[in-house]
């Protein structure tokens, strides 16, 4: 029997954090909510509720690399926030390269005729879903490679 996948995908911004979850099989990521950042302790309480409700085992955070592959100041701020959050929630933390996910999220929402410049939270949730989906797809690919190697 396959292990249940219980991950939260996060698109961390200065004002908001887009949050995504996935089905238990780890096939499909879906945007769940957007958390308006206030102060860190209040943010942690909001995340604790999600972690308990969904029995989360890992945080997957998008890391905004520069186009040349380096970590800029925004990426370092995301790392700092994510590290503190993972420690407060006592969860392991994994990163995914999130270059252009907000752009991709906007394009997906436009294609679905759901995009609005007034609803930034929707874009944040969609970006979080893209981040988590990348992580799920990478895990699945690695598992397939391991299976092929064992044949």
From Swiss-Prot:
Keywords: Cytoplasm, Hydrolase, Nuclease, Ribosome biogenesis
Gene3D superfamilies documented for this protein: YqgF/RNase H-like domain
Subcellular localization(s) per the UniProt record: Cytoplasm
The keyword Signal is annotated on this UniProt entry: no
Intrachain disulfide bonds: none
GO molecular function, one term: nuclease activity
Enzyme Commission number(s) from the entry: 3.1.-.-
Chief location of this protein within or outside the cell: cytoplasm
Domain of life according to the entry: Bacteria
Function noted in UniProt: Could be a nuclease involved in processing of the 5'-end of pre-16S rRNA.
Name of protein: Putative pre-16S rRNA nuclease
Protein species of origin: Gloeothece citriformis (strain PCC 7424)
